[in-house]
């Protein structure tokens, strides 16, 4: 079971930048807001830990794909809000194209390698009654 979980996390790791940019494409958001929206939109299937999310946001900012701005919240707290840049929109378009190509290729591979029953093997079919 642990091996399956690790594989699932490997797939997710490759989509973190894409998902964060998708969530930021329409408005500024802060880190906790991003993680909550991501979990909610994915029905809890895509959780992003702070230890993964913040370094990714930092890297996207360093690469010019995001801008960050500190805003005061309440008396003593500040939040860092992230906003996608024009370079970020270009990068997002590139990531979406890559994702579409890869998932399309994987779908084709899955279709071609689907298990086909051997002769004499029982295959359940739906009855048309």
Give, region by region, the residue ranges found by the protein language model.
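C-terminal regulatory/oligomerization modules of transcriptional regulators
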Residues: 1-8, 67, 97-129
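N-terminal helix-turn-helix DNA-binding core of bacterial DNA-binding proteins
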Residues: 9-52
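Glycine-centered, phosphate/nucleic-acid-interacting loop/turn motifs that mediate DNA/RNA or nucleotide
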Residues: 64
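Basic, amphipathic "hinge/linker" alpha-helix immediately C-terminal to the N-terminal HTH DNA-binding motif
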Residues: 74-96
């Amino acid at each position: 079971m642990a091996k399956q979980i690790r594989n699932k996390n490997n797939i997710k790791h490759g989509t973190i930048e894409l998902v964060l940019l998708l969530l930021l494409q329409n408005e500024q958001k802060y880190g906790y807001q991003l993680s909550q929206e991501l979990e909610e939109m994915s029905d809890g299937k895509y959780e992003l830990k702070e230890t993964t999310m913040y370094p990714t946001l930092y890297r996207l900012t360093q690469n010019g794909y995001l801008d960050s701005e500190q805003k005061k919240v309440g008396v003593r707290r500040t939040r860092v809000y992230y906003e996608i840049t024009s370079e970020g929109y270009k990068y997002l378009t590139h990531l979406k194209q890559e994702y579409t190509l890869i998932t399309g290729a994987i779908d084709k591979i899955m279709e071609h390698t689907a298990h086909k029953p051997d002769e004499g093997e029982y295959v359940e079919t739906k009855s048309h009654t």
